């Protein structure tokens, strides 16, 4: 055997003795339990991370749902406000039209009343003028009691027909 292989032999024997001592002492159980506990700790951390991820996803979904609800509510509020504004505008327009119609009717009634009064006044003035003209004409043509009676009858008849 050469020197190199003798050295390798001693290294192999020393290694086997070292491993044998470790097995005899129970180091493999300590190393195994340390690896097992580390594996369990890593598994627990992974489970916690998964749980936190699910919780975060639930919160994100909840916030998105609430945002959609808030947007829908805001949209319905805007729609209701527009509808209310349109209703109020049409109501105000209807009231204004009613007011204008009533004012126009009142003005037309006043004008009609004034026209009727003016016609009545003109008829009365015309009747008086006709009666005076008839009195003057008949007064010069007919004299005495018969003339006075004819004039009175004619004046009364003209007044009743013109009024």
UniProtKB/Swiss-Prot annotation:
GO terms for cellular component: plasma membrane; proton-transporting ATP synthase complex. It is a single-pass membrane protein. Keywords: ATP synthesis, Cell inner membrane, Cell membrane, CF(0), Hydrogen ion transport, Ion transport, Membrane, Transmembrane, Transmembrane helix, Transport. It is found in: Cell inner membrane. Its main location: membrane. The keyword 4Fe-4S does not apply. The keyword Cell membrane applies. It holds the Pfam family ATP-synt_B. The chain crosses the membrane at residues 6-26. Coiled coil: none annotated. InterPro entries: ATP_synth_b/b'su_bac/chlpt (IPR002146), ATP_synthase_B_chain (IPR050059). F(1)F(0) ATP synthase produces ATP from ADP in the presence of a proton or sodium gradient. F-type ATPases consist of two structural domains, F(1) containing the extramembraneous catalytic core and F(0) containing the membrane proton channel, linked together by a central stalk and a peripheral stalk. During catalysis, ATP synthesis in the catalytic domain of F(1) is coupled via a rotary mechanism of the central stalk subunits to proton translocation. Component of the F(0) channel, it forms part of the peripheral stalk, linking F(1) to F(0). F-type ATPases have 2 components, F(1) - the catalytic core - and F(0) - the membrane proton channel. F(1) has five subunits: alpha(3), beta(3), gamma(1), delta(1), epsilon(1). F(0) has three main subunits: a(1), b(2) and c(10-14). The alpha and beta chains form an alternating ring which encloses part of the gamma chain. F(1) is attached to F(0) by a central stalk formed by the gamma and epsilon chains, while a peripheral stalk is formed by the delta and b chains. Belongs to the ATPase B chain family. This is ATP synthase subunit b 1. It comes from Xanthobacter autotrophicus (strain ATCC BAA-1158 / Py2). The lineage of its organism: Bacteria, Pseudomonadati, Pseudomonadota, Alphaproteobacteria, Hyphomicrobiales.
